[in-house]
């Protein structure tokens, strides 16, 4: 298999009960891309993975089947299985520090308090991987963060959340076609 231009991995929790939650926005972005690119995701170890082409670039899409806080196991496993250079990985996550409707793409960085990203960094042994954060807002009472991230967007938030997911999909495609700098210039 030729080396892909990008393997985009959307973090979230497995199971229908989490499908439409804020915490699963990474999965939702991958679902949108798989539909747009007609890429079917197949079970492989502890992830769903699919491969296809965008323009003239090979692109991979994946969603871990592990819970968010154990996402690093799946990400590290995929990287090892496909012998991918770290700069070919893009991890997509929810971010409660960003307003609903916004995205932020970075080539490296901290976990920002996100347990899924922290576990990915731990298992990869580095923070030098690209990440795409999709804003979910933080409109919750003190001590209710878990309830907030594990609930769906409100009716008022849905249009902005949908727009952010579409922007995130476009950012992934821009990164696959061009590079992360082009995607950051367009979407940050």
Swiss-Prot record:
Its EC number is 3.1.1.29. Its main location: cytoplasm. One of its GO terms (biological process) is protein quality control for misfolded or incompletely synthesized proteins. It is found in: Cytoplasm. Keywords: Cytoplasm, Hydrolase, RNA-binding, tRNA-binding. The active site is at residue 23. The keyword tRNA-binding applies. Monomer. This is Peptidyl-tRNA hydrolase. The gene is pth.
């Amino acid at each position: 298999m030729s080396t892909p231009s990008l393997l985009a991995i959307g973090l979230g929790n497995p199971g229908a009960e989490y499908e439409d939650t804020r915490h699963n926005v990474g999965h939702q972005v991958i679902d949108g891309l798989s539909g747009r690119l007609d890429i079917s995701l197949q079970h492989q170890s502890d992830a769903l993975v699919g491969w296809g082409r965008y323009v003239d670039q090979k692109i991979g899409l994946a969603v871990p089947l592990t819970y968010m806080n154990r996402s690093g196991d799946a990400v590290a496993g995929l990287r090892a299985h496909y012998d991918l250079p770290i700069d070919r990985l893009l991890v997509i996550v929810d971010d409660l520090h960003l307003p609903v409707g916004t995205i932020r793409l970075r080539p490296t960085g901290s976990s920002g308090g996100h347990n899924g990203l922290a576990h990915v960094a731990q298992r990869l042994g580095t923070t030098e991987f690209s990440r795409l954060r999709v804003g979910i807002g933080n409109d919750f009472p003190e001590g209710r963060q878990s309830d907030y991230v594990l609930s769906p967007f409100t009716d008022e938030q849905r249009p902005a959340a949908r727009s952010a997911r579409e922007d995130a999909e476009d950012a992934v495609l821009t990164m696959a076609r061009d590079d992360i700098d082009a995607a950051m210039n367009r979407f940050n």
